């Protein structure tokens, strides 16, 4: 339902809707007389080019211009305001804050700078007058220090940047989008934004307008609600499927439930009768047991005399056994002494071998060390000769390097002479080039003047024709829009009709293809399962055939005799007649040598096989006769083992019970352990020793000896499945069947892929048709309204074209004036072009002369430098060789000393080993003497032991005679006990049968208990067989029914689950509908808010651009007219007398005018009290500068504009001039009121 890592907003609908903020209120009213914010003055203290305290202002309430020469510090005024408003140092054209502190020759080591911006709220009055709102004055300041830290103050109190930002935003200063701020070169970028941001964090025209209009606050809630609706739809679909599935399962079980209830009714009657019969049998058996117990008490009286005689013989037996134990201890002690001495001798023998090996190794080592000493001495002599050779190389190379240095000085002098000669050669060409460049500068001045006259004449003509051209353009555009709307309306109505026809057909075909795809999928699963099983069988058959072929010649000959029928009783090799898990392969291969024995039916068959092998001289083999294996049948039962370790025999799977007996003969009670530690624990138990093998093939015998292990282990002597005799023809037949089904599976898979592709296409087509149908149906009404509106608008525009028609005579006069100026411009431009071409030719000639003569001499000098580098490298290598030889000589001498020491140590070791060998030989001689003495005294002890055993045998024979009599009596008792036990067993059986009887509840009826009959009732039963017959009839009826008793509980469970699933579906459906309605309402609210603001802004933009360009046109277009948020907003402009263009294709001046028109339109929609603009008129000609200046002065009377400008058309119209000038590296300012000066006649 949700992608991994996705965070889903799980808030309730009420919480999501309540978290949406209300539409932002306007920062200030656009009506006259409304209060607004203005800057009174700015105080700079040691900020950038200002030293000490400098006051800028006072600023006018409407239009102030900052003027001054380049480099005087005009832009620092903007920087000071940016500094206070919290911008980073890089935005203020500095790398860090400390750079903002003033630094000049007169003022050094200043530790801080401060900027204060003073604000007040006013109400405009007539002219330049205004009323200050009481207590509205406040001052925001920021101080930066040398350590790049800064602090903020509001009206003298220390505050954080967040407090400053909140205060300025509350008064309408847009710090988030910087609409109040247009820096140098940034005016064009406003209108050049992309229609829509390309990424989540990118901002395009759509996002820019959304933030201003205020509907951007709805974006996140819409996304949250959309995602929640998607998740709820997916959850609801899942719940609906579950309801349908449970309902289907419930209906399917109902029939079986009814049969089960009928069955339980019959079973209840049968159990009641069975209960009566079982109680009768228990009662009858108990009577017989009581009679046998009386008989048993009489026999016990006859056993007392035999018991007394047995006790006497038992005491005598104990005495003799004690004597036997004493003599056995003495015998054991003598035997143990002999064994210990033999073991000592074996140990000494082993030590003797080890010492002799060490002695041999020491002798060999001494010879090797002698050879190594000789090599080390030769190496010392070689290293002593290296320094002399290296010094000879250094002397020769140093001499060669000195001669090359002298040659280098000569070549460098030659290079300098060549360079001096080139300078004199090109002197005349340089003079001629400078004269031509001076002439070109004069021509350029004439070209600029001619171009200016031509553009002024063209502007006058454009202004005169602008109203008529605008009217004609609007009429043409309205007609084109009407045609487009009518055609679109007609096309969409036709498309709706076509979709309504095709959609049902597509849906029907999709259902059919989905059914066929489901059928093919099931068929593919079945075929793949069949192919997989066949493949395994073929592989097993091939493996069996290969194993049969790889048998030895003896086994092969015996099997051949079996197949021919000459010796019919042969089964085969024992390992091939059984199977074991691959985990135990190594264990059984290591511990069971009998796996290669050949199994036959009898000893006679085995003898026939032996005779056959001898007769044909094939070899020998060991045989197992199954007729002799029956003795092991009783021991094959499961046994209790230490730590429940598995018995290897129990893990073997054999063909039949007879073969299992042969495997027990081969394995007996051998256990298999995981590792050697467990095997050791299991093998040595107190009461018994076990034969144990590990999974790694290590074996512990019952005697305690351990074998196996090592790097090579035995494996593969027994397979994981019983080998079946199979012919090559059968294998071929199975392979043919496998190929047939594999081919069929591939064909089904290809059909499935084709159907899947078709289903995907049909689903996509159905979805596309549904989306298109919804989209077209929604747009029909809008297109109809647009068609009616445009018909009325065209009539109005046709009347407007007639009223704005120009005077033909005046138009012709202006056009002739433009043509005359153009001819004058073309003539001057042609002369300037010829002079410019001559300057380029002279420049190229000078460059070519320099390159030709300088190259050869430079190559000679480079070759000498290369040889000097090679000499230096050779000297360095020789010096390194001298140093290395000294170090290596010390190492070689150390090696000689070390080798001589090792030779001495080896001689000492050899002597020590010879002495040790002599000591071992002496100890061995003493051990042999002690062993011989003990063996001489052993026969006398053994004779005494045999006499005691003979006496013990006589006592045992007497005891056996008594035991025979006791056994006869015991057998009688056991016979009686056997009958009693048998009757008790039958009683337990019938009691168990009664305990099994449980009367099941039928539907909601209470559970009945089983009745207990009294002795009188049981005696009254004369014929239990008739009840048994009735039970048999009822059992037959029940057996024929074959009900599913679980169907009752399953039906109840399904019914409960069905009701639960329906309740869950209703709940999630209601929740989904609420979220979907809220989602649609928010989308409509966002669209309505955006389009209301958008129409106001685009209409004002059109009006502003027409006014600024005197006839041009501009508008904000929806890229997708049906959904403004899908593709964004495109800014299109039609400059005067030009076609419609995208903003990116305009000239610099046209982009500036377009951007300013948009800025003033946004100001009209959402007024901002302050605007700071830095040289926004840089790309405009004098006419457009005047138009922009008059517009600012006349149309924006409800805001304060502070503009940096160098164009007199701009600053002469302003209400207040702030002059900036710099003397002695310090910026100063002066405020002038132009109107006041003009009124006094001072200008």
Curated annotation (Swiss-Prot):
Keywords, A to Z?
Acetylation, ATP-binding, Cell cycle, Cell division, Chromosome, Coiled coil, Cytoplasm, DNA condensation, Mitosis, Nucleotide-binding, Nucleus, Phosphoprotein
Q: Which domain of life is it from?
A: Eukaryota
The places in or outside the cell where this protein is found are: Nucleus; Cytoplasm; Chromosome
Signal sequence region: none
UniProt: ATP binding residues = 68-75
- Residue numbers of N6-acetyllysine PTMs: 336, 634
Query: What are the record's GO terms for cellular component?
Result: condensin complex; cytoplasm; nuclear lumen
One biological process term from GO is:
cell division
Q: What is its main location?
A: nucleus
Query: Which Gene3D superfamilies does the record cross-reference, listed alphabetically?
Result: 1.20.1060.20, 3.30.70.1620, P-loop containing nucleotide triphosphate hydrolases
Q: Report which residue ranges the record marks as coiled coil.
A: 225-546, 721-975, 1062-1090
Q: Where is the SMC hinge domain?
A: 568-682
Q: Which SUPFAM superfamilies match?
A: P-loop containing nucleoside triphosphate hydrolases, Smc hinge domain, Tropomyosin
Q: Segment Disordered: which positions?
A: 1-30
* Similarity annotation: Belongs to the SMC family. SMC4 subfamily.
Stated role: Central component of the condensin complex, a complex required for conversion of interphase chromatin into mitotic-like condense chromosomes. The condensin complex probably introduces positive supercoils into relaxed DNA in the presence of type I topoisomerases and converts nicked DNA into positive knotted forms in the presence of type II topoisomerases.
Domain remarks in the entry? The SMC hinge domain, which separates the large intramolecular coiled coil regions, allows the heterodimerization with SMC2, forming a V-shaped heterodimer.
Q: What is this protein called?
A: Structural maintenance of chromosomes protein 4
Organism, per UniProt?
Answer: Microtus arvalis
Q: Which taxonomic lineage does the organism of this UniProt entry have?
A: Eukaryota, Metazoa, Chordata, Craniata, Vertebrata
